[in-house]
């Protein structure tokens, strides 16, 4: 017996949609949605394809996701070619199976079933889909959200299909995410010969006490919903490659994953004060890729928890751990935002796979969420 969720997932995997190339995935989704009465608005920006689709009116529940995938790596190391979906021992293999073409298929099939049973549903059901989530994310969801906000589009609830689960589908629901702030710092010195240090100014030596103090800071202790803020040095570069040249500059890149206990401005102020304390000559560039957001218990979280408990008989953990997602952009609209998707154990890896039965389960969960919020 064929399964529409598995079949649609396989069709999507066969399209090698390396970010930001959609490779025809959205056309497939749009065709299915238009067939059940959705109005579709394509919202392409630069090399990125996006669409916003809706059916009905009133209180709005949107399902959000991305059609793009990360590169497969060495295809010879896959048990099957990465863009040729294969089921082995109940597991569906292929790039994007878990992140997140399986979720997209589950969303669309859930919508088809929901509309068939509730053709005159009272709320509005919507989809926000992009082909630029895995790469720069500059022309994807953030641009669509800006356009929707500019015309006062309504969005009450949003479910992002990112692979949130750890061991079984629904064991973890993400009801928020930490903020992400990156600092690109250059410490300026004076280049010179290592035999004549008095004629130079070594920026590595100058910066060492600053960096030692920076990494020792306890930024906060987190709270009920968020772990403590984390600061990690990601890159350090200095020198010409020669052993007899004192470098003229030191470049340090570090990233903060921060909770709602802090703002990005508070972090910046503390870093800049520390730089001044150590009397360093520097230039600094900040990149805020997302503010922290949190969806407290309410109609959306309750509907998601209910759906998971109904179909999997487990109570999901509500967590805010992990990296950023497009939920950070959607939260700007004032919507309640949660993430519910398949098990994430193999995402971005060789032999990415998902339990085929989990995708069927996910479609049922998504449909039950629709029934609770917009039926």
Swiss-Prot record:
- Pathway, per UniProt? Amino-acid biosynthesis; L-lysine biosynthesis via DAP pathway; LL-2,6-diaminopimelate from (S)-tetrahydrodipicolinate (succinylase route): step 3/3
Keyword tags: Amino-acid biosynthesis, Cobalt, Diaminopimelate biosynthesis, Hydrolase, Lysine biosynthesis, Metal-binding, Zinc
Query: A Gene Ontology biological process annotation?
Result: L-arginine biosynthetic process
Describe cofactor binding as the record notes it.
Answer: Binds 2 Zn(2+) or Co(2+) ions per subunit.
**GO MF terms held by the record:** acetylornithine deacetylase activity; cobalt ion binding; succinyl-diaminopimelate desuccinylase activity; zinc ion binding
Kindly indicate whether the keyword Metal-binding belongs to this entry. Answer: yes
Query: Which amino acids does the record list as binding Zn(2+) 2?
Result: 99, 134, 348
- Looking at the keywords, is Zinc present? yes
In short, the EC number is: 3.5.1.18
Whom does it interact with, and what assembly results?
Homodimer.
Listed name of the protein:
Succinyl-diaminopimelate desuccinylase
Q: Which source organism does the UniProt entry give?
A: Escherichia coli (strain SE11)
Instruction: Cite the source lineage.
Output: Bacteria, Pseudomonadati, Pseudomonadota, Gammaproteobacteria, Enterobacterales
